[in-house]
Amino acid sequence: VHLTGEEKAAVTGLWSKVNVDEVGGEALGRLLVVYPWTQRFFDSFGDLSSPDAVMGNPKVKAHGKKVLNSFSEGLKNLDNLKGTFAKLSELHCDKLHVDPENFKLLGNVLVCVLAHHFGKEFTPQVQAAYQKVVAGVANALAHKYH
């Protein structure tokens, strides 16, 4: 992903304030609630029967944290997202058979959650930079599908 110096500063500046546990669980939970067909990849997570069940599910929260920790690694390697996410791309493609469109959906949900958490601080410029990043990460995760 090519970001200007200003965009990189905006992304890393905001990310340094992100509570990965909280935001990760909320982002994955919202994905599962807003796009319920994505739940089929999480059969082992137990009760996903209602929005409250999803948002309170400890396995959703734990996996959301894991997802955002990987995203954090991506932010440290913006110039090599394909390399950073190669193993995860392979896992999600070959073993889990996740629809690569879901990576885009999760990226967009993450942007919504960041906007919700940071309010006025999440300016249109910050959003534009994050949209570039989540699109780059989604492309890197979809790489093994091509």
Curated annotation (Swiss-Prot):
Organs and tissues of expression: Red blood cells.
A Gene Ontology biological process term: hydrogen peroxide catabolic process
InterPro entries named in the record: Globin, Globin-like_sf, Globin/Proto, Hemoglobin_b, Hemoglobin_oxygen_transport
Entry keyword set: Acetylation, Heme, Iron, Metal-binding, Oxygen transport, Phosphoprotein, S-nitrosylation, Transport
Pfam families: Globin
A GO cellular-component term linked to this record: haptoglobin-hemoglobin complex
S-nitrosocysteine: modified positions: 93
Gene3D superfamilies noted in UniProt: Globins (1.10.490.10)
Coiled-coil stretches noted in the UniProt entry, renumbered to this chain: none
Transmembrane segments: none
Binding-site positions, heme b: 63, 92
Span of the signal peptide: none
Ranges for domain Globin: 2-146
Sample GO molecular function, one term: haptoglobin binding
Domain of life: Eukaryota
Record-listed Phosphothreonine modification sites: 12
Modified residues (N6-acetyllysine): 59, 82, 144
PANTHER family: HEMOGLOBIN FAMILY MEMBER (PTHR11442), HEMOGLOBIN SUBUNIT BETA (PTHR11442:SF42)
Family as reported in the entry's similarity comment: Belongs to the globin family.
Protein purpose: Involved in oxygen transport from the lung to the various peripheral tissues.
Subunit structure: Heterotetramer of two alpha chains and two beta chains.
Protein name: Hemoglobin subunit beta
Organism classification: Eukaryota, Metazoa, Chordata, Craniata, Vertebrata
